[in-house]
Amino acid sequence: MTLINLFLALVLAVFELTTPVAAQRFDQVVRTDFFAGFAGDQARLQKGMAACETILAENPKHAEALVWHGAGLLFQAGLSLQAGDTQRGMELFQSGLGQMNAGITLQPDNVAVLIPRGAVLLTATRNMDPAVGRPLLEQAVADYEKVLGIQEAYFDTLGDHPRGELLFGLAEGSARLGRPEKARAYFERLIKDAPTSGQSKRADQWLKTGTLPKIVGTGCIGCHKP
């Protein structure tokens, strides 16, 4: 269940990284069902997927519904691959990735669209052959870098937890891409700007040793419940 737990952890963590104040966001409408589904409640996952499908039937260009539905498909792809159904898993993966990419194309500067794709790809690439996963990991880091650029104007108004999760994703992704200077800069900023995020110990270990503790179970240090 490691892949599922990692997927859940990152998605739960980064969906907090939105604008500091927002009206009823789309993710607030569907996320509890998706979070419960990612934790193993298939009925709740189907409820969340159905909500997205209803929105998309009315508006096929609803960017947030596309990325959420795409995230659900990628989660289902992971389940199929774990069950040994490679063909179905790859079909779901390609479909989910296509939906997430379509959402980004529609709203390339929307944090609530960028973050889901970045989060899912950061997690999914942990289990991929580097030759296949590297381009997707590069895209994930690019998504997070764009989010950071968008949020710089109000980054200090966000809590330590969302700041820490974004910076940790950037740092860890950069390290996995073989970009130690960038990784160091992000880890150092994490310790400075988000000292109580829960990721400071991991950042400090990397700065001292060049390695991170193995992520077992959930990767997010915060407290999230469906």
Which residues does each PLM region occupy?
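Terminal, low-structured helical/coil segments at or just beyond the last alpha-helical repeat
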Residues: 26-28, 153, 157-164, 176-226
